[in-house]
C-alpha cells in the first residue's frame, strides 16, 4: 500500500530582485497512515516551506508530492494546517470559531455538528463554547484551534510550530494534550519544530532538515510510555534545552 504522503526529490527556489534563492533541494521522505512524524531543523532551513508545499500553497519546481500514490493536485484526501498562531477571531465565540471551516466549505451537517460537539466535550472546551478567545488561556486557545482543524476530519494534519508562542511550561502541557488528542483520534500528523526534545517526545520518527538543504530520517527507538508525560516536574526542567549545536 502506498504511503499516505511521499515527497520524491522535491526542490524549490524563491525568485527575488537580488537573484534566485534555493529553498529546498532533493527532499525525499514519506509518512505512513497513523504516523506522527516531526520535521526538525534550525530557522531558515525550509521546514515551513515543506508544509506549504504539502498543503498546496506552493508548487514544487522539481520532484513530486503524492498522497496514497496520487499526485497531490489530484488527491481527494484533505489536509489540515495548524499554524504557529491560533488565528481565532476575537469577535466570535469559541463555538463559532470551530465551526468556521465547516461553514466556509459548506459542510455543516447534523453529523459534522455532532462531531464538533463530541470534540468540545471530550477535550475540555464544552463549558467554554460560548466564551470568546480573549477569555481563554493560551493552551485552551490552541485546543480550540486544533478542534477547528479536526472538525474537517483531515486525512493528514500539518502542525507548524503550534506551541512556539506559549511559555515553556505551558508548551509542555499543551503538547501533551495535543499528542493525546491526535493519538485518540487516530490522525496522521507532520509536526515542524526546532525543539529536538519536543520532536522526540511526540514522534514515531524524526526527519532532520539541515541548512545544507538535505534531510535525514531518524527513527525514535524509545517506547512512548518512557517518553511521556513530559510535564512531570524535573529539577533541570526550568529552561528549554539548547539544541542549536545539533545542526
Question: Each predicted region: which residue ranges?
Answer:
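Conserved ABC ATPase signature
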Residues: 132-136, 140
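Helix-to-loop junction immediately C-terminal to a conserved catalytic motif
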Residues: 55
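The feature captures the beta-strand-to-loop junction immediately N-terminal to the Walker
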Residues: 40-42
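Conserved ABC transporter NBD signature motif
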Residues: 63-75
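Short coil-to-helix segment of the ABC ATPase nucleotide-binding domain corresponding to the Q-loop/switch region
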Residues: 92-99
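Conserved ABC ATPase "signature" region
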Residues: 110-128, 180
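A short, proline-enriched helix->beta-strand linker immediately N-terminal to the Walker B motif
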Residues: 151-155
Amino acid at each position: 500500500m502506498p504511503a499516505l504522503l511521499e515527497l520524491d526529490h522535491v526542490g524549490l527556489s524563491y525568485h527575488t530582485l537580488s537573484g534566485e534563492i534555493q529553498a529546498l533541494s532533493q527532499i525525499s521522505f514519506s509518512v505512513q497512515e497513523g504516523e506522527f512524524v516531526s520535521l526538525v531543523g534550525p530557522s531558515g532551513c525550509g521546514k515551513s516551506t515543506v508544509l506549504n508545499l504539502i498543503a498546496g500553497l506552493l508548487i514544487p519546481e522539481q520532484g513530486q508530492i503524492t498522497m496514497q500514490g496520487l499526485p497531490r493536485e489530484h488527491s481527494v484526501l484533505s489536509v489540515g494546517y495548524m499554524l504557529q498562531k491560533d488565528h481565532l477571531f476575537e469577535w466570535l465565540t469559541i463555538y463559532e470559531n470551530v465551526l468556521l471551516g465547516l461553514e466556509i466549505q459548506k459542510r455543516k451537517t447534523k453529523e459534522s455538528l455532532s462531531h464538533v460537539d463530541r470534540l468540545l466535550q471530550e477535550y475540555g472546551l464544552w463549558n467554554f463554547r460560548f466564551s470568546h478567545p480573549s477569555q481563554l488561556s493560551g493552551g485552551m486557545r490552541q485546543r480550540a484551534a486544533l478542534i477547528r482543524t479536526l472538525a474537517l476530519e483531515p486525512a493528514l494534519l500539518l502542525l507548524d510550530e503550534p506551541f512556539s508562542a506559549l511559555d515553556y511550561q505551558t508548551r509542555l502541557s499543551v503538547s501533551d494534550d495535543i499528542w493525546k488528542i491526535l493519538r485518540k483520534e487516530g490522525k496522521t500528523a507532520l509536526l515542524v519544530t526546532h525543539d529536538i526534545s519536543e520532536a522526540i517526545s511526540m514522534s514515531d520518527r524524526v526527519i532532520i532538515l539541515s541548512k545544507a538543504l538535505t534531510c535525514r530520517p531518524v527513527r525514535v527507538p524509545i517506547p512512548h510510555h518512557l517518553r511521556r508525560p513530559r510535564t512531570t516536574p524535573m529539577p533541570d526542567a526550568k529552561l528549554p534545552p539548547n539544541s542549536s549545536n545539533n545542526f
